[in-house]
Curated annotation (Swiss-Prot):
It holds the Pfam family ATP-synt_B. This is ATP synthase subunit b. It comes from Pseudomonas syringae pv. syringae (strain B728a). One of its GO terms (cellular component) is plasma membrane. It is found in: Cell inner membrane. Signal peptide: none annotated. The chain crosses the membrane at residues 12-32. GO terms for molecular function: proton-transporting ATP synthase activity, rotational mechanism; proton-transporting ATPase activity, rotational mechanism. The gene is atpF. It is a single-pass membrane protein. F-type ATPases have 2 components, F(1) - the catalytic core - and F(0) - the membrane proton channel. F(1) has five subunits: alpha(3), beta(3), gamma(1), delta(1), epsilon(1). F(0) has three main subunits: a(1), b(2) and c(10-14). The alpha and beta chains form an alternating ring which encloses part of the gamma chain. F(1) is attached to F(0) by a central stalk formed by the gamma and epsilon chains, while a peripheral stalk is formed by the delta and b chains.
C-alpha cells in the first residue's frame, strides 16, 4: 500500500470532519441525550410519586370505608335500640291504657251493681210491704213504715 497525497487528503478531511462533528454536532446530540435522560428520570420519579400517592389514597379510602362501615353499624345499632325502646314504650302505654280501661270498666260495673242492688232493695221493700199486706189482710201505710223498709233493705 502506497501512501500518497490522496490518502493524506482523505485523512485530513476525515480529521476535519471529526473536529467539525465534535464541535457542532456532538454537543446538541449529547444535550438531547441528557435532556431525554432527565425527562425519563423525572417521569420515573413522577411515576414513583404517583404510585405512592395512589397507595396513600387507597389506604385513606380503605380507612374511610372502615369508618363508614363502623358508623353505619353504630347507626343500625342505635336504630335497633330506638325501635326496641319505641316498642317498649308502646307496650307500656298500651298496658297503662288497658289498666285505665279496666279500672273504668270496673267502676262502671261497680256503679251498675250498686244501682241494681238499690233497685232490688226498693223492689224487695215493696214486695215485703205487699206480702205483709196480703198476710195481714190490711193496708199498711208506706210512709209510716218507710224507715222500717229502708232498714230491712239495708240489711239485705
Amino acid at each position: 500500500m502506497n501512501i500518497n497525497a490522496t490518502l493524506i487528503g482523505q485523512s485530513v478531511a476525515f480529521f476535519i470532519f471529526v473536529l467539525f462533528c465534535m464541535k457542532f454536532v456532538w454537543p446538541p446530540v449529547i444535550a438531547a441525550l441528557h435532556e431525554r435522560q432527565k425527562k425519563i428520570a423525572d417521569g420515573l420519579d413522577a411515576a414513583s410519586r404517583a404510585a405512592r400517592d395512589l397507595e396513600l389514597a387507597q389506604e385513606k379510602a380503605g380507612q374511610q370505608l372502615r369508618e363508614a362501615k363502623a358508623q353505619a353499624a353504630e347507626i343500625i345499632e342505635q336504630a335497633k335500640k330506638r325501635g326496641t325502646q319505641i316498642v317498649d314504650e308502646a307496650r307500656e302505654t298500651a298496658r297503662v291504657e288497658a289498666d285505665r280501661v279496666k279500672a273504668q270498666a270496673q267502676a262502671e260495673i261497680e256503679q251498675e251493681l250498686n244501682g241494681v242492688k238499690d233497685a232490688l232493695r226498693a223492689q224487695l221493700g215493696s214486695l215485703a210491704v205487699n206480702g205483709a199486706e196480703k198476710i195481714l189482710g190490711a193496708t199498711i201505710d208506706q210512709n209510716a213504715h218507710a224507715e222500717l223498709v229502708n232498714k230491712l233493705a239495708a240489711e239485705i
